[in-house]
Swiss-Prot record:
Belongs to the TRAFAC class translation factor GTPase superfamily. Classic translation factor GTPase family. EF-G/EF-2 subfamily. One of its GO terms (cellular component) is cytoplasm. The keyword GTP-binding applies. GTP binds at residues 17-24, 88-92, 142-145. CDD domains: EF-G, EFG_III, EFG_mtEFG1_IV, EFG_mtEFG_C, EFG_mtEFG_II. Keywords: Cytoplasm, Elongation factor, GTP-binding, Nucleotide-binding, Protein biosynthesis. It comes from Methylobacillus flagellatus (strain ATCC 51484 / DSM 6875 / VKM B-1610 / KT). The keyword Protein biosynthesis applies. This is Elongation factor G. Catalyzes the GTP-dependent ribosomal translocation step during translation elongation. During this step, the ribosome changes from the pre-translocational (PRE) to the post-translocational (POST) state as the newly formed A-site-bound peptidyl-tRNA and P-site-bound deacylated tRNA move to the P and E sites, respectively. Catalyzes the coordinated movement of the two tRNA molecules, the mRNA and conformational changes in the ribosome.
């Protein structure tokens, strides 16, 4: 089966934005203009195609990244057909993990900003993630029809807040109620869309006289940006003062893919204006799978390997998302980097070392699925029938294994105890939770050994609320949820050397294990590190793994209040053994005893999670908000002015002080402030706080 669309005409893009920038409405319009949906779904009515989980439709926010495939021939239908795979990513800070995982498989992104709200804190988080993965992107300023809309202010904000380099390729004609269309700076024509056809039809007209100077000024900036792409273009521009349409597009494309600039467009998705021109920009400026560097991985023995985006290469793909579907069971979304995969084939999961058979392959268009025979390099699709695959694992051909770089998922910072309302639901709840944990790696489930309660952990209160909600809807399990608990940690402050000796003589074979270890603080975020420095066989080789195991088993419960110990380096440097009585268990016990003793002597401290909090508030309430944050042991980091008045206050606050903050901030500001928070780092808890926690235990 030949490829319908050449890979050069593929675009794998994400649409990413702050919560209310109108991202889902923008995605909807894309699907409407590309002919995937025939009726426009509005988030306002809770009927958007890409928001297909019930909670998303109720809450009007997007939680999971749906992957949708559509085709576009250009606004004037004059181009060859391009295939666009869109991943709609959530904007809420509790779902940052979803953004992170979709950035990994995208080739380009379209950032949607609100013309009134501008660049908001969540946009900065997403921007940082896109920088980290070097994702080329363009910006779309939406909601130009709203009161207070200001396109040029958002351009300035992108420079200030994101250190971006935005290059407008269109500018708006009018704003607010008078927003009529856009000026295309490449063609130097005004574009007006026809309301009766819901924006399907449009016409080019001359630029309104009062906008001509502004248009010329911005066109010059754009042409200069394009000319900087190469010496050849720069020389031509300096000689003639002009570049052709094709040269401008080529220059801007080259610099966008190199992440040096971000082309900028604007419109109003709700009023059916501007999204069509943005789709053209996706074709013009964002890369196809061939335009970006080859994907990098390693062989099973650790040598670096690359794979070209080519059907003739060996097959490699990344499973970037799992979803349980009521009709077909588990859907595994994969991004194919190289080669071809046909349904019914067996592939190799190089991360886990298991073989998997692909049952069926489906292409998703939001919530409809079309079965297909095969997927090729550059495709994004969902596979059915993969039992053992989890998020972030590599699938590849059996004969030519490659392990692509794994995704790194953040540790959860908040936990709650959960129990089913009826005893009969216990088993169902276990099943539901393990299925949800498989889908979402930033969500964890464990059983507390002391209380036998089921504990679920995640990235924030909203994250866990939605998990409990999904359990009820998708698995019919009603649950009671306890008060949120903070994930504290323990660490040591000074190096110590300690010995652990485990000797047991009670008739028959005895037990003997003896170790000397040095414990010292490790760099923050390094975790546990074990170093073997045994010389002259004082601890025999075969028992050294047992020492490491004994330490690992002791680490999950520290000496202060039983919290996991982090960032500790342990060096085994001496010990002794008995020819007959020494065994693995004895050395495991000796290591565990030494570790506990060392913890007590090494100035143990309690660490608490600190959150980066950003509150956007009208100026009148600024003092109250700052006072309240300080009373929560918050440290104010700085303040920014917001577009359209108001302040954004940035602070670092311990998570334990942030429970129920939503209610407080609402009453302090009469509901006019919004806030977001994300995990920043662990820090030592003050003595009085630590004592209270230890005494509670």
């Amino acid at each position: 089966m030949a490829r319908k669309t050449p890979i050069e005409r593929y675009r794998n893009i994400g649409i990413s934005a702050h919560i209310d920038a109108g991202k889902t409405t923008t995605s909807e319009r894309i699907l409407f203009y590309t002919g995937v949906t025939h009726k426009l779904g509005e988030v306002h009515d809770g009927a958007a195609t890409t928001d297909w989980m019930e909670q998303e439709q109720e809450r009007g926010i997007t939680i999971t990244s749906s992957a949708v495939t559509c085709f576009w021939k250009g606004m004037d239908l004059s181009r060859p057909e391009h295939r666009i795979n869109i991943i709609d990513t959530p904007g809420h800070v509790d779902f940052t993990i979803e953004v992170e995982r979709s950035m990994r498989v995208l080739d380009g992104a379209c950032m949607v900003y609100c013309a009134v709200g501008g660049v908001q804190p969540q946009s900065e988080t997403v921007w940082r993630q896109a920088n980290k993965h070097k994702v080329p992107r363009l910006a779309f300023v939406n909601k130009m029809d709203r009161t207070g809309a200001n396109f040029f202010k958002v351009v300035e904000q992108m420079k200030l807040r994101l250190q971006a380099n935005p290059v407008p390729v269109v500018i708006p004609i009018g704003a607010e109620d008078n927003f009529a269309g856009v000026v295309d700076l490449i063609k130097m024509k005004a574009i007006y869309w026809d309301d009766a056809s819901q924006g399907m039809k449009f016409e080019y007209k001359d630029i309104p006289a009062d906008l001509l100077d502004t248009a010329n000024e911005w066109r010059e900036k754009m042409v200069e940006s394009a000319a900087e792409a190469s010496e050849e273009l720069m020389n031509k521009y300096l000689e003639s003062g002009e570049l052709s349409e094709a040269e401008i597009i080529a220059g801007l494309r080259q610099r966008t893919i190199a992440t040096e600039i971000q082309p900028m467009l604007c419109g109003s998705a709700f009023k059916n204006k501007g999204v069509q021109r943005m789709l053209d920009a996706v074709l013009d400026f964002l890369p196809s799978p061939v335009d970006i560097p080859d994907v990098v991985g390693e062989s099973e023995s650790g040598e670096p390997l690359t794979r070209k985006a080519d059907d003739n290469e060996h097959f490699s793909a990344l499973a970037f998302k799992l979803m349980s579907d009521p009709f077909v069971g588990q859907l595994t979304f994969v991004r194919v980097y190289s080669g071809v995969l046909t349904k019914g084939e067996t592939v190799y999961n190089s991360t886990s070392g298991r073989k998997e058979r692909i049952g069926r392959i489906v292409q998703m268009s939001a919530n409809e699925r079309n079965e297909i025979e095969e997927i090729r390099a550059g495709d994004i699709a969902a596979c059915i029938g993969l039992k053992e695959v989890t998020t972030g694992e590599t699938l590849c051909s059996i004969d030519h294994p490659i392990i692509l770089e794994r995704m790194v998922f953040p540790e959860p910072v908040i936990s709650v105890a959960i129990e089913p309302k009826t005893k009969s639901d216990q088993e169902k709840m276990g099943l539901a939770l393990s299925r949800l944990a498989q889908e979402d790696p930033s969500f964890r489930v464990r059983t507390d050994e002391e209380t036998n309660q089921t504990i679920i952990s995640g990235m924030g209160e909203l994250h866990l609320e939605i998990i409990v909600d999904r359990m009820k809807r998708e698995f019919n399990v009603e649950a009671n949820v306890g008060a949120p608990q903070v994930a504290y940690r323990e660490a040591i402050k000074k190096p110590v050397e300690v010995e652990g000796k485990f000797v047991k003589q009670s008739g028959g074979k005895g037990q003997y294990g003896h170790v000397w270890i040095k414990m010292e603080p490790n760099e923050p975020g390094k975790g546990y590190e074990f170093i073997d420095q045994i010389k002259g066989g004082t601890v025999p080789r075969e028992f050294i793994p047992a020492v490491d195991k004994g330490l690992r088993e002791t680490i999950p419960s520290g000496v202060l209040a039983g919290f996991p110990v982090v960032d500790v380096k342990v060096t085994l440097f001496d010990g002794s053994y008995h020819d007959v009585d020494s065994n693995e268990n004895a050395f495991k016990m000796a290591a565990s005893m030494a570790f506990k003793d060392g913890m007590r002597k090494a100035d143990p401290v309690l660490l608490e999670p600190i959150m980066a909090v950003e509150v956007e508030t009208p100026e009148d309430y600024m003092g109250d908000v700052m006072g309240d944050l300080s009373s929560r042991r918050g440290v104010i980091q700085g303040m920014d002015d917001l577009v359209g008045g108001g302040k954004a206050i940035r602070a670092e606050v311990p998570l334990s002080e942030m429970f129920g903050y939503a209610t407080t901030v609402r009453s302090l500001t009469q509901g006019r402030a919004t806030y977001s928070m994300e995990f920043k780092h662990y820090a030592e808890a003050p003595r009085n706080v630590a004592e209270a926690i230890i005494n509670k235990k």
